Amino acid sequence: MLDFNASASLSERIESLIDPALQAENQAQTPRTYLGASRLGAACERQLQFEYAKAPVDTGKEFSGRILRIFERGHRTEDMVIRWLRLAGFILKTEDANGHQFGFSTAKGRLKGHVDGVLIGGPEGFSYPALWENKCLNSKSWRDLQKNKLAVSKPIYAAQLALYQTYLTLHQQPALFTAVNADTMEIYAELVPFDAALAQRMSDRGALVIRATEAGELLPRSFTDPTHFECKFCSWAERCWSTKK
C-alpha cells in the first residue's frame, strides 16, 4: 500500500484527486450565452460586462475545487429546505408543467433568470402566490444578514428578488427569502416586499450592460483603486486594470 503520508497528508491527497475532477466537470459544462439576472446587483457594471462577454478570467482566478464544493453545498441545501418547507405544509412548486425550472427570458434571450420556487399555498399568515429564494451562508455572513436584513446586508440578493418578482408577476405578495447557516443549520427567514424602483434600476442596468457590451463600449469601473476589496476578489481584475480607462 502506498504511504501517502510520506509526502502529503491524506486530506491533501484526497483533495488532490477530487478537485481536478470537479474542475474538469465544471469546465465541460456549456457556458451561459446570456446575462444572468441573479448577478445584476453586483457592485461593478464592468464586471458584468466581462461575465456577459464570457471573457477569460485572470490566471489563477478559475474556480477552485473548494469553491465548487461550496457551490454544490448550496444546491444540496436548497433541496433540503424544499423538503422541509413541504413537510411543514407549504405547497412549493419548483418546476413548470414541462419539468423545467421556473424562470424568465427577456431581451431576446440575452437576459434570463431562474428562480428557486413559487409558494402557491400553505400555512396561515402568509400570502400566496409568492416567490421563494434560498441561500446557504457561512456563520459570519448569516449573522450579518440576521442583524441588518436583506436589503442592507445582501443587496445583490435583494436585486435578484426584485427582478424575479417583476418578471414573473409575483410582485403583489412579499417574497419569502430563507438563508441557512451552513455551520449551525439555523434558518433565517424574511418577507421581502416588492421594490419597484429597485427592479426598474436593475432592469435598466441589464439593458445597459448588454447594449454597451455588444457595441464594444467598456463601461466605467465602479472603483478607483485596484486594491479595493471588490477588485481584489474580481476574476477579471488584472484584465480590467491593464486598460487605461
Where are these regions (language model features)?
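Conserved active-site beta-strand-loop modules that form the wall/rim of enzyme catalytic pockets
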Residues: 127-134, 172-177
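Short acidic, glycine/tyrosine-flanked loop/strand segments centered on an H-E-D-like triad
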Residues: 135-148
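A generic secondary-structure micro-motif detector
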Residues: 71, 150-151
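Metal-dependent nuclease catalytic regions and adjoining charged, substrate-binding loops involved
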Residues: 4-6, 144, 151-158, 163-245
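Metal-dependent nuclease catalytic cores that hydrolyze phosphodiester bonds in DNA/RNA
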Residues: 1-131, 138-140
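Structured loops at beta-to-helix junctions and adjacent beta-edge loops in soluble globular domains
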Residues: 51-53, 135, 180, 237
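Alpha-helix initiation/capping motif
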Residues: 36, 64, 136-138, 154, ...
